[in-house]
Amino acid sequence: TLGSSCVIHSHAYAAVRGMPLRNAAEDFYLLNKLGKVGPVHCARGAGVRITSRQSNRVPFGTGPAVGRLMDAKDPCEVPLFYHADCFAVLGQLLQLFWHWSNEPETDTQAQLTEHLGTAVGADLQRLLTQWGYQKALRHIHQAGRSDAARRQHIHTWFDGFKLLKVIHLL
């Protein structure tokens, strides 16, 4: 797995309380937590080749995806990636979030609808509200004394887990 190829400084590992105990995606959750306590680097040089195999050990991930490909009548019809439009919407949402962190009194619902359409805007508004984004925006605005600090606060709050939830919503 990807997690088997990670090198983690002991201080960072202790700061995030070690490997998360989950049924799947432990490496994703670990990297998500590590990104909040320090930089995550990508090693240069020879890459690690991960071979895939069919597996039902976990509810999602490479093993079940390989199983779907092998079970499909036409493997070319099985989606391998998230639709590119998801990332375009995600980019717009992050730009809006940056704007809102600088102007926390903005009408976020109106801007979501204006930039992303009524249906997507309403869905994202519900998800963000569920996460308590207004409180997060106020905190980011007050605590972030510089653009760099606000950006760091945004990336800490709007972490990889939340970004993936947005992609799955879309």
Region locations from a protein language model:
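Generic structural hydrophobic/aromatic packing signal, biased to beta-strands
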Residues: I8, L30, A43, V48-I50, ...
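Conserved nucleotide-sugar donor-binding
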Residues: T1-V16
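Terminal low-complexity segments of carbohydrate-biosynthetic enzymes
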Residues: G67-L170
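Catalytic donor-sugar/metal-binding loop of nucleotide-sugar-dependent glycosyltransferases
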Residues: R22, L34-R49, S55-N56
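Acidic donor-binding loop at a coil-to-helix junction in glycosyltransferase catalytic cores
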Residues: R22-Y29
